[in-house]
Amino acid sequence: MTVPSASRDQSQGRHLVAWILQAMLATVFFAMGIGTLAEIPAAADSVDQVGLGDCFRLLVGIIEIIGAAVISLPDVAVLGAVWLATAMGFAVLTHLYILEDSPVRAAVLLLASVLVTVLRRDQFSWLRSRFL
């Protein structure tokens, strides 16, 4: 096996892992966003416990759905990953300091979003050259 072939295999593997994570994150965040907007107890309870009212619940649901949509778009998936990582960073802090419960689910989603950001980092240069 030559070096270019090994590099191509790694790139294809990285690409496949990124797509799998993106599909998982899009599915999870779309379901969470719909659940939060529809006030399904499993999804909306922790948002309601923050105590900021319905406007905050709507904002969280919209943030989750936007993130799910953007991470699904091939050319700008890295922006969706950064968006979701930021949201999950705040979710971890909220679970630790306001709700005082386990942030494990939010932390796992944060790590998955960061991993997609790392795997799709080449999109930053493409976006910069295209829009700046």
Predicted segments, located by residue:
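Short juxtamembrane and helix-loop transition motifs at transmembrane-helix boundaries
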Residues: 37-48, 63-75
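Solvent-exposed, flexible loop/coil residues
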Residues: 41, 56, 60, 108, ...
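Hydrophobic alpha-helical context, especially transmembrane and signal-peptide helices
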Residues: 17, 24, 42, 52, ...
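Solvent-exposed, well-ordered loop and adjacent helix/strand elements within mature globular domains
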Residues: 27-56
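Core segments of alpha-helical transmembrane spans in multipass integral membrane proteins
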Residues: 31, 52-72, 86
